[in-house]
């Protein structure tokens, strides 16, 4: 899995990217104020565990699969109104982030959540990413 993350970052740089999005990984750091249940849900996630809800409303959101996403996708599939969908998700992020309800709350996370395997400090995460990517790319100086 670590190799997959390294390759993913390297490949994007080789295609001309100047940066990669790492929000999900930083949510699961020691410094993040989200509930421990949220962090643990990310760490336990498999590569098939994220779902996109809200396509029908024009406001897509990627979140980890749970009861809330299942209900939302069922409602969306059956043509529920914007108001019905809004009612289901109202306060959903707070439920997950503050209350730790990762079953009924909105556990927003990117496609790469499965690559997050441990809670570490932001400093350690950045150092690890830089050293792993440098090793793959071929040494220092790539980022300058």
How would you label these PLM feature ranges?
Residues 10-144:
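Conserved active-site-proximal phosphate/metal-binding subdomains
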Residues 1-9:
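Single conserved hydrophobic/aromatic residue that forms the stacking wall/gate
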């Amino acid at each position: 899995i670590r190799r997959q993350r390294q390759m993913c970052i390297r490949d994007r740089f080789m295609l001309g990217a100047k940066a990669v999005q790492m929000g999900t990984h930083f949510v699961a750091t020691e410094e993040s104020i989200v509930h421990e249940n949220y962090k643990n849900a990310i760490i336990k996630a498999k590569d098939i565990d994220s779902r996109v809800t809200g396509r029908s409303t024009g406001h897509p959101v990627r979140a980890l699969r749970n009861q809330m996403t299942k209900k939302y996708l069922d409602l969306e599939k059956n043509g529920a109104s914007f108001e019905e969908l809004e009612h289901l998700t109202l306060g959903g992020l707070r439920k997950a982030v503050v209350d730790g309800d990762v079953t009924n709350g909105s556990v927003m996370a990117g496609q790469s959540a499965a690559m997050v395997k441990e809670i570490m400090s932001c400093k350690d995460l950045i150092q690890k990413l830089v050293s792993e990517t440098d090793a793959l790319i071929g040494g220092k100086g790539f980022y300058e």
